[in-house]
Amino acid sequence: MSEDHFDDEHEGHGGGGGSRHPMAARFRGYLPVVVDVETGGFNSATDALLEIAAVTIGMDEKGFVFPEHTYFFRVEPFEGANIEAAALEFTGIKLDHPLRMAVSEETAMNDIFRGVRKALKANGCKRAVLVGHNASFDLGFVNAAVARMDMKRNPFHPFSSFDTATLAGLAYGQTVLAKACQAAGIDFDGREAHSARYDTEKTAELFCGIVNRWKEMGGWQDFDD
């Protein structure tokens, strides 16, 4: 199925594709929302979702984008979920930590989706497009959680995404998040990495920096057309 066909079939979703809000004009009716997940492995169908964060993107009166609102949840593994010891060692997540205060997948996804739908309405956009560093990984886990809970109101496009690994490779010659941020002049603390919240906020800064740099170079000017 092509993206255009999907859009035609789902035109009623979101905040109204006909709006001329500058954000809707800039991204063809889509609202970029940065997402990062920390998981119990690489398989979205079998491995646990342990953390998820999302950052909505705003736009100022001059057409420059910026990170707006952050949503973050530690997530209880779904029943029967696989969790690889190597994944916990890599992320540093301690499932039995008394301050972890995890919530169910349903609570996390519903709260994030509620915030995304609010941002869609505010920006006159019809649907969110996931932005991620190696975005297919994050989108796969979002889609798997949606399928597990049979959620009917997923604001995200099911297969389109913006990948900051690709964008950073083009803009800065770097595809690793930490190195791409450093090349972009964004502070990055490796001790904070592999927290969904930290990685999402840094990915949002990187995405906005690339989009704004492109605009400054003349690549996007008349966002009212």
Curated annotation (Swiss-Prot):
Annotated family: Belongs to the RNase T family.
Disordered: annotated span: 1-21
Annotated positions for site Important for substrate binding and specificity: F42, F90, F137, F159
Cofactor note: Binds two Mg(2+) per subunit. The active form of the enzyme binds two Mg(2+) ions in its active site. The first Mg(2+) forms only one salt bridge with the protein.
Binding residues annotated for Mg(2+) 2, in chain numbering: D36, E38, H194, D199
Molecular functions (GO terms): 3'-5' exonuclease activity; magnesium ion binding; nucleic acid binding; RNA exonuclease activity, producing 5'-phosphomonoesters
Cofactor: Mg(2+)
Descriptive protein name: Ribonuclease T
Subunit structure: Homodimer.
EC nos: 3.1.13.-
Keyword Coiled coil set for record: no
Family matches, as Pfam families: RNase_T
Gene Ontology cellular-component terms listed: cytosol
Task of the protein: Trims short 3' overhangs of a variety of RNA species, leaving a one or two nucleotide 3' overhang. Responsible for the end-turnover of tRNA: specifically removes the terminal AMP residue from uncharged tRNA (tRNA-C-C-A). Also appears to be involved in tRNA biosynthesis.
Top-level class of the enzyme under EC nomenclature: hydrolase
Alphabetized UniProt keyword annotations: Exonuclease, Hydrolase, Magnesium, Metal-binding, Nuclease, tRNA processing
Record: residues binding Mg(2+) 1: D36
Signal sequence region: none
Glycoprotein is among the record's keywords: no
Membrane-crossing segments per the record: none
Coiled-coil segments on the chain, per record: none
Record-annotated Exonuclease domain positions: 33-207
GO terms for biological process, alphabetical: DNA replication proofreading; tRNA processing
Catalytic machinery residues: H194
